[in-house]
Regions:
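Detector for small/aliphatic-rich hydrophobic stretches
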Residues: 2-8, 13-200
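Residue-identity detector for glutamine
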Residues: 35, 43, 52-55, 84, ...
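Short amphipathic beta-strand starts and helix->beta connectors
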Residues: 95-103, 285-287, 320-323
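Non-catalytic, conformational "gating/processing" segments within enzyme and secreted inhibitor domains
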Residues: 103, 142-306, 330-357
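Extracytoplasmic/secreted cell-surface and envelope-processing proteins
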Residues: 126-133, 310-312, 346-348
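Short Gly/aromatic-enriched secondary-structure transition segments
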Residues: 132-136, 251-258, 313-321
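Internal alpha/beta scaffold segment
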Residues: 305-331
Length: 357
């Protein structure tokens, strides 16, 4: 089984924003979720492109057909936009992780970062909201991007062979008479993102609760995202994503052999290499690779820059459209592949990364 920690984001905003979760809380934390996102009986709430809720009415099959047609085009635009955002995030995150050390790996989860920032964008206004939308959804409107993001997150497969779990939460400091959260914002994130809402004193018990619940939501893959809560923090938004999938066709023992894996700096290390033959070949200018299927329709994608081109150089020239088209246009050329068994972990503060974006 291949286990991938998709990621957790704790993003401290201007007023100390960020947060988390659902059971096993200390006695100082209060579940406020039931107070938000409610609607009167007989009303149907829909989330608009800007994340606001409103009543939806049946406008007939013609409008529905047009909506589905438009959604197809919007979703395609989102796929390109999301890929570009992902590459932008990886490039800037890698710069922070490397910090002059080429031997370090970088793991980021664009979906987790995007969801947490989308919740923050929902509560923003004016230039801040516009700028956040431009970063999150390059090349398309933030309203359309937000709509598709919510639909995709709710439709991703979650089954025995491929577990996908996402948790969104808002924590509000209750021991603060100065800060009062906007109820419309809390209603929106509860309705649009199924976020839970908690009140807490923002002391050491709150810090433990957040870490404990992130660990729970990620099946133990992430055990800590906070070591302390700043005095000025008044609200937390936290998104946690966990992905745990099996290969559609597992490697058998005869396909796993000891081999030497060479890193970018030329150093070699002994690894267990998983060999296979595939017809899902990927090629682009200055790189080639392959796809391999997980269960439930998920794919693992590996790309290798051509010899003589560093990973940083390749990432700098790669754009979302090229990357997306490469994956869409895989060809059935038979190739032999070797993939090392590996684990990876990245711990980084995203403040500088997001500022660079």
């Amino acid at each position: 089984m291949e286990r991938v920690t998709a990621g957790v984001l704790a993003a401290v905003m201007a007023l100390g924003m960020t947060g988390c979760a659902n059971s096993g809380m200390s006695g100082t934390t209060t579940d406020l979720t039931g107070q938000y996102g409610t609607k009167e009986e007989g009303q149907t709430e829909g989330t608009g492109a800007n994340g606001q809720t409103g009543q939806a009415e049946d406008t007939g099959t013609e409008d529905t057909a047009m909506e589905e047609k438009d959604l197809g085009a919007i979703r395609e635009a989102f796929e390109y936009s999301y890929t570009q955002f992902s590459l932008n995030l990886l490039r800037e995150s890698r710069k922070q992780v490397q910090n002059g050390e080429d031997a370090k790996n970088t793991m980021v989860c664009p979906l987790s970062v995007m969801m947490a920032l989308e919740m923050a964008r929902t509560g923003a206004d004016g230039d801040t909201k516009q700028q956040m939308g431009a970063v999150l959804y390059p090349g398309m409107s933030a309203e359309d991007g937000s709509m598709v993001l919510g639909r995709i997150c709710k439709s991703l497969p979650d089954a025995e062979g491929a577990r996908f779990h996402m948790s969104d939460s808002v924590w509000v400091k209750t021991a603060d008479d100065v800060f009062v959260p906007d109820e419309n914002f809390l209603d929106t994130v509860k309705t649009a993102y199924d976020a839970e809402v908690f009140g807490a004193p923002f002391d050491e018990t709150t810090c433990r609760d957040i870490n404990r619940l992130v660990e729970q939501e990620t099946d133990g893959m992430i055990t800590e995202i906070l070591d302390q809560i700043p005095e000025l923090a008044v609200m937390y938004l936290v998104n946690a994503v966990a992905f745990d999938a099996e290969w559609e066709t597992p490697y058998d023992e005869s396909q796993i052999q000891d081999a030497t894996f060479y890193a970018e700096d030329g150093s070699g290390q002994e690894v267990s290499m998983m060999y296979d033959t595939t017809y899902r070949y990927l090629t682009m200018e200055h790189a080639e690779g392959f796809c391999r299927a997980y269960k439930e329709g998920y794919d693992f994608v590996a790309l290798l820059p051509e010899e003589g081109l560093s990973l940083s150089e390749w990432l700098e020239e790669l754009d979302g459209e090229t990357f997306h088209e490469t994956i869409r246009q895989e060809n059935d050329t038979m190739i032999e592949t070797g993939l090392p068994q590996f684990t990876g972990e990245t711990d980084l503060e995203l403040k500088d990364t997001l500022t660079a974006l």
